[in-house]
Amino acid sequence: MLVSDLVATSERVAALSRRVEKIGALAALLRRFSPAEVQIGVDWLTGRLRQGRLGLGPSVFAEARRASPSVAQPALTLGDADAVFTEIARASGPGAGGERRAALAGLFARATDLERDFFARLLAGELRQERLEPVMVDAVARAARVPPASLRRAVMLAGDAAEVVKAALLEGALGLQRFSLQLLRPVQPMLAQSADDVVTALSELRAMALEWKLDGVRVQAHKAGDEVRVFSRGLGPVTKAVPEIVEIVRALPVRSVVLDGEALAFRPDGAPHPFQVTMRRFGRAHDAAALRAELPLRALFFDVLHLDGEDLLDRPGSERTAALRQVLDRSLRVPRIELPTAAEAEAFFADALAHGHEGVIAKSLAAPYEAGRRRGTWLKVKRARTLDLVVLAAEWGTGRRRGLLSNLHIGARDPAAGGFVLLGKTFKGMNDEVLAWQTQRLLELEIGRDADTVYVRPEIVVEVAFDGLQSSPRYPGGVALRSARVKRYRPDKPAGEISTMDEVRAIHAGALAGEAAEKGQAEGGGEELEDDG
């Protein structure tokens, strides 16, 4: 298949507003994939690369564009481009950077303008398809003529969506029957949608339980006899990084079990370390024994998917919790209350925050375990943190946001140096009316632009909600926002009164203060890490 065909469908799907139209367009494309193109195409359409991150940034894309003119007649195939991405991923050692740039330049020399734009967004992780994955499942189901529920279940159990999609497209419903829960193979995790507060969650779910929401690393632990394997939320193996969790699970008095939970590092005072600190245990290269002594982990589990030969996925949440209590001591389970009143729910939420955690998750007592975010099953409620920041630039949108300035570059005031410091980007929290207004207003403030971005005078103030801060060498202030979203514009506030970098650094330092106190004069410096969500 030509890349141009996939790009055209991607653009069309992003521009469509009706779900049924998106499904139809994707299904028509999926039927045209060859077996070798299934994984490539599905990954690209949902904004992923099977090769993982390739370490290429905007300057490399700009250099590749300048190196040669684009072509007018599309000829690149999915296999052609995928082979180049594999070449880039394999480049290593001295001169690897030059090899990657040369490979990308060669690809861009064979691509049209639209294909170049698509590749740049795909490689930068900025190919946003309005949460396309749930739509993709329904599109595959239509293309393969299989029930969507059967397909979703197979994807959850297999972990590898491409394998399931290929089976569905080539073998239909019969091909899906071979997928089942297998010990020592990860299952795609169940996720939570957001709710504004615990009272809202209580009214939506009614018969529910509340659990503390921990800011740790999601882990899935499998035991089959004496063998134990642990996987991350992304289904990658992390067994070697967490020997203490392996020991705990291996010692359980059961023959086989699959547990879902969180791994956290705690400070001596009992408060949890920030997510970034816990993530040091999961770095690419590390001495697990040394890190264990320096930063021990605890596992707190909240679900059980299999127990002694019996799969529990289809059991209601209340029954899975009962099974979990039979297997695990209270010290290994996430704190939980069931059927709370509104007052009890508020108190439980406050208690979670007081212990240094993110908030709570409300869970339906009747819900089975299903991968992804399912409406009416799990709802997360977190304490909202906000900063008043200024808009420094905005990127042109794609798909249904084409022609509108969408992705805002936002920054804080730096009184010491003068001016403003970029803290992050966000395209979240803006409806169509706000997008239209901000496009007009930002263009009035334009001071320059490049191919994708309009730079503006720093005058417009926005209130931004965020989940946390992380150290980041990619940003000039060394700190970046996590999960930023616009709450509202602040026309009442001048840019000279917005949040300062001192405030931002104080928030970040406060989160890391426990670690600094514990390590004293210890050597510092951590790598930039990302929340696994």
Swiss-Prot record:
Keywords: ATP-binding, Cell cycle, Cell division, DNA damage, DNA recombination, DNA repair, DNA replication, Ligase, Magnesium, Metal-binding, Nucleotide-binding. ATP binds at E211, R218, R233, E262, F302, R374, K380. Disulfide bonds: none annotated. Its cofactor is Mg(2+). One of its GO terms (molecular function) is metal ion binding. HAMAP family: DNA_ligase. DNA ligase that seals nicks in double-stranded DNA during DNA replication, DNA recombination and DNA repair. Signal peptide: none annotated. Gene3D superfamilies: DNA ligase, ATP-dependent, N-terminal domain (1.10.3260.10), DNA ligase/mRNA capping enzyme (3.30.470.30), Nucleic acid-binding proteins (2.40.50.140). Its EC number is 6.5.1.1. This is Probable DNA ligase. Belongs to the ATP-dependent DNA ligase family. SUPFAM superfamilies: ATP-dependent DNA ligase DNA-binding domain, DNA ligase/mRNA capping enzyme, catalytic domain, Nucleic acid-binding proteins. It comes from Sorangium cellulosum (strain So ce56) (Polyangium cellulosum (strain So ce56)). One of its GO terms (biological process) is cell division. It comes from the Bacteria. Residues 512-533 are annotated as: Disordered. It catalyses: ATP + (deoxyribonucleotide)n-3'-hydroxyl + 5'-phospho-(deoxyribonucleotide)m = (deoxyribonucleotide)n+m + AMP + diphosphate. The keyword DNA repair applies. It is an enzyme of class 6 (ligase). The active site is at K213. InterPro entries: ATP-dep_DNA_ligase, DNA_ligae_ATP-dep_bac/arc, DNA_ligase_ATP-dep, DNA_ligase_ATP-dep_C, DNA_ligase_ATP-dep_cent, DNA_ligase_ATP-dep_CS, DNA_ligase_ATP-dep_N, DNA_ligase_N_sf.
